[in-house]
Amino acid sequence: MATQVFSNCGTYFGQYVISTDMSAVALSTAADALEKTAMGATVRTFKKGLYDTKANVEGYYSAGTGLISPILDETYFAIKDVPITIIPLTTQYVENCGAYSFPATIATWNSFGGVGEMMKFRATAETTATPAIPGYVAYYGTKTAVGTTYSTALQITGGAPAGKNIYCALHVFSHSAGGDTLDVTLQNDALVGFGDPTDCIAMTQSVAVGYEWKTDVGAAAHAEDFWRVKMVLSAEPISITFAVFFGIY
């Protein structure tokens, strides 16, 4: 995957939407090529090593609770496996829009600026666990009513055949107090009506703001074509704002 630079994109990091504080994101995925050439071979052969996936983020420094600088420098610096989800084409959510996501660690952070200039920042979120997983943001919004709802079904021809992994990221941006809960499950089925859905990934029940990255590694075949997210909310009063990403790779 070549480096891709996005200058007008939506970005979720952990429990925060950081899009409005950034001016650009450069996303890249590479992998180590480890030589395994045998004695007497006439050609060199290689084996894939660790991934090197990075999102280089830059923008304008903003200090204060819930703002970009303390989020990246204090809250998440050197914290492992915080999901970052990048929507390349728009800062606004569109249902089932294409996105990339991976479990990241903020490995570098610096702020800089000359006298009389706006202070800027640069940060690098990276991982060796996965590539930048291509997928979809199945839902982003606020739920205020108890009950079960579903995202709009998305058709992915061939689904997730055996040997493919399924990935899911949950970003919970706000969560009302009072015992309300959110359960998110990724489902698929052979038919768009979901008469007999299969649960593929069940996220940990959410009771507060936070995030989770979950993987069905070496998944059994989920080759049905239609995919959706099931969302179950309980207890009132309730108001939960969250986003759900899933991808197959």
Model-derived segments and their meaning:
Residues 1-63, 95-126, 131-161:
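Solvent-exposed edge beta-strands and adjacent loop segments
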Residues 63-66, 172-181, 234-239:
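Extended, low-complexity, turn-rich repeat/linker tracts enriched in Gly/Pro/Ser/Thr and Asp/Glu
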Residues 65-107, 187:
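Short, acidic/charged, Gly/Pro-enriched secondary-structure junctions
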